[in-house]
């Protein structure tokens, strides 16, 4: 019996994440690579499929999935373009505003197309976010340290922001630290989301790492996740590709497709 493969376009295939995703798709039995989208491409074909420099050239193209691993400044327009043209977006690019996410969810419902924007595709990172949401009920004083490679363009990371947003659902907003604390250097205490501080580290040699540090009287709790290389994201990407074919609206966060 012939297997009906899910047809995938990869946008951002020249990046490290995109290149890893292309190999995963090529090696997967139930996926079929259909086209690649890059920036100022000088080739017309790679891996046996056509290569495009303009997303508009993909209008009417035969594909199910638009896998977007591009840049924050392009992600919103790319995701909306995908929905407009009948592709189900699976997006690993971060940097979306709350209004942009809300708009895309609304638009996906109008188009009756499934999709996914995932701040992090690593299953361990998704579990870290969920564990943090549970822990903050008992440890409301918390700070986040996220560490990434020095090529990452946005700060704080989408994972850190999503973690803080999830914890804010269970935590009353309040200031942490001395009431009269003063920063000797501007920004020393990090970004502030409802009183939770988020600190961003950018260094060569890192991939993607996050610590959520809780403090209480006489004790502390630290939750940490590490992605040592980009293969850690491929299980989540593959899961997302499969799952968006079964739903009719865009979801924000891989946790919507996990049994948590």
Curated annotation (Swiss-Prot):
Annotated EC: 1.17.1.8
Reactions it catalyzes: (S)-2,3,4,5-tetrahydrodipicolinate + NAD(+) + H2O = (2S,4S)-4-hydroxy-2,3,4,5-tetrahydrodipicolinate + NADH + H(+); (S)-2,3,4,5-tetrahydrodipicolinate + NADP(+) + H2O = (2S,4S)-4-hydroxy-2,3,4,5-tetrahydrodipicolinate + NADPH + H(+)
Active site, renumbered: 148 (proton donor/acceptor), 152 (proton donor)
Pathway this chain belongs to: Amino-acid biosynthesis; L-lysine biosynthesis via DAP pathway; (S)-tetrahydrodipicolinate from L-aspartate: step 4/4
Gene Ontology cellular component terms for the protein in this record: cytosol
GO molecular function, one term: NADP binding
Taxonomy, superkingdom: Bacteria
Residues given in the record as NAD(+) binding sites: 12-17, 92-94, 118-121
UniProt-listed GO biological process terms: diaminopimelate biosynthetic process; lysine biosynthetic process via diaminopimelate
Binding-site list for (S)-2,3,4,5-tetrahydrodipicolinate: 149, 158-159
Family annotation (InterPro entries): DapB_C, DapB_N, DapB_N_CS, DHDPR_bac, NAD(P)-bd_dom_sf
Function: Catalyzes the conversion of 4-hydroxy-tetrahydrodipicolinate (HTPA) to tetrahydrodipicolinate.
Name of the protein in its database record: 4-hydroxy-tetrahydrodipicolinate reductase
Source species of the chain: Lactococcus lactis subsp. lactis (strain IL1403) (Streptococcus lactis)
